[in-house]
Amino acid sequence: MSTSMSVARSLPGGPVAEQILAEVAQEVTQLRAAGVTPALATVLVGDDDASVGYIRIKQRQAVQLGFASPHVRLPASASQADLQAVVTQLSADTSVHGVLVQHPVPPHLDFDRAMQALDPEKDVDGMHPVNLGRLALGLPGPTPCTPAGIEALLAYHEVPVAGREVVVLGRGATLGRPLAMVLAQKRPTANAAVTVVHTGVPDWPRYTRRAEIVVAAAGVPGLVRPEHLRPGAVVVNGGVRYAGRRLLPDVDESCATVAGAMTPRVGGVGPTTVAMLFRNAVRAARRTRSSRTPVRLPDSGAPAGR
């Protein structure tokens, strides 16, 4: 007698990203026709392989979309004053509409202090304290890219979120905490009952086992296994680590035998994060055109479903 094992439905991020980037490209075309070339400046400190790779991806995408893409690279030995001087200069440059400081920075530097030197209107990562405060209050503003991308991914694949129990496993400033705020917003693509738990809680699986949606955001490879999940749960693999160029996700691939739907190891959340970066950037450029009627792209971070 043979038995078959169910496999979770895949939730790829590629189609979501393509839809968002098509909207961005249309807006870039309109801005350029009005005499504005959107410019996204990137800042990299040091030579971390993963960070260099990320910057190359973003610069390549910027060129494809029609953005100008100035880049500043500082040595790993750069001081806090060096980094903040660059950020301040880019903030004051009227030809630059968005600024991305690639994270992580070398350990002797304070990323948060550098972000405070940035004009909040040019914060395409959504990580300036002013913009995080706006998110907490439910006010419009740049949303952190990975949380916004996760909301969009779930909406595109028609995964119901409103009223469901969501557990975010991880409390980091770039994903776990802002994602909890995003998914608790009062709108159809969010409005969830969100619990944030982390590896400092000895019995964290007690929370994930009851969740209808689990978002892994801990940055601990292989942390989430099938026994940590409720059968049929939706699983989003947001947390990753790199060993050289090898991607090590939080969610073990064997979870696909228990989950009802799951993002793939490669091509899941990553593409939507990049797409949201450019959506934030084009909106920053659009805000400089105060005299023109804005194109009304949705502010929720969630494109329409399929």
From Swiss-Prot:
A Pfam family the protein falls into: THF_DHG_CYH
Any one GO molecular function term: methylenetetrahydrofolate dehydrogenase (NADP+) activity
Pathway(s) the chain acts in: One-carbon metabolism; tetrahydrofolate interconversion
Protein residues bound to NADP(+): G170, R171, G172, T199, V240
Disulfide partners: none
Gene Ontology BP annotations: L-histidine biosynthetic process; methionine biosynthetic process; purine nucleotide biosynthetic process; tetrahydrofolate interconversion
Disordered: annotated span: 285-306
Reaction(s) catalysed (UniProt annotation): (6R)-5,10-methylene-5,6,7,8-tetrahydrofolate + NADP(+) = (6R)-5,10-methenyltetrahydrofolate + NADPH; (6R)-5,10-methenyltetrahydrofolate + H2O = (6R)-10-formyltetrahydrofolate + H(+)
Keywords: Amino-acid biosynthesis, Histidine biosynthesis, Hydrolase, Methionine biosynthesis, Multifunctional enzyme, NADP, One-carbon metabolism, Oxidoreductase, Purine biosynthesis
Family: Belongs to the tetrahydrofolate dehydrogenase/cyclohydrolase family.
Matches recorded under PANTHER family: C-1-TETRAHYDROFOLATE SYNTHASE, CYTOPLASMIC, C-1-TETRAHYDROFOLATE SYNTHASE, CYTOPLASMIC-RELATED
Biological role stated in the UniProt entry: Catalyzes the oxidation of 5,10-methylenetetrahydrofolate to 5,10-methenyltetrahydrofolate and then the hydrolysis of 5,10-methenyltetrahydrofolate to 10-formyltetrahydrofolate.
Protein name (Swiss-Prot/TrEMBL): Bifunctional protein FolD 1
Protein's organism: Salinispora tropica (strain ATCC BAA-916 / DSM 44818 / JCM 13857 / NBRC 105044 / CNB-440)
Organism ancestry: Bacteria, Bacillati, Actinomycetota, Actinomycetes, Micromonosporales
Gene encoding the protein: folD1
